[in-house]
């Protein structure tokens, strides 16, 4: 019983750390995006023309926008998923699938065998081994 409480507390702390890490990543990314937008703003001085655009590289701007947008979406969705997992005490991918289906109104029993193809089962096993090795550290 005491071991179960320690294990649950350890799991909850790990879930909390993942959520706060994802939230911090999202906030830092949004701050960088805000700063990048402010830097690109063109404010002409009193004798400068206001219709002349400053020189810039379209390729660099596109790469910067793609990087910022990707980081913002990854941060937002990871915060959402880790928060969902923390709130519902989900620690494995299998639990996540069952809770998500239950949340969406598709109840499924834990005993039913969800068959996976060979590649998916290998990938799932690798991910669970990676997560379990993080828990052991």
From Swiss-Prot:
The keyword ATP-binding does not apply. Disulfide bonds: none annotated. Keywords: Membrane, Transmembrane, Transmembrane helix. It is found in: Membrane. The keyword Membrane applies. It is a multi-pass membrane protein. InterPro entries: AIM11 (IPR038814). One of its GO terms (cellular component) is membrane. The chain crosses the membrane at residues 20-37, 66-88. Belongs to the AIM11 family. PANTHER family: ALTERED INHERITANCE OF MITOCHONDRIA PROTEIN 11 (PTHR39136:SF1). This is Altered inheritance of mitochondria protein 11. It comes from Saccharomyces cerevisiae (strain YJM789). The gene is AIM11.
């Amino acid at each position: 019983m005491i071991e179960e409480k320690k294990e649950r507390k350890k799991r909850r702390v790990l879930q909390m750390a993942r959520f706060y890490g994802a939230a911090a990543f999202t906030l830092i990314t949004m701050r960088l995006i805000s700063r990048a937008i402010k830097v690109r703003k063109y404010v002409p001085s009193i004798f400068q023309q206001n219709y002349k655009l400053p020189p810039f590289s379209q390729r660099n701007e596109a790469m910067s926008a793609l990087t910022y947008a990707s980081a913002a979406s990854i941060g937002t969705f990871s915060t959402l998923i880790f928060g969902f997992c923390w709130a519902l005490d989900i620690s494995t991918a299998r639990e996540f699938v069952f809770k998500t289906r239950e949340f969406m109104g598709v109840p499924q029993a834990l005993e039913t065998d969800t068959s996976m193809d060979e590649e998916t089962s290998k990938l799932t096993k690798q991910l669970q081994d990676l997560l379990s090795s993080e828990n052991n550290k």
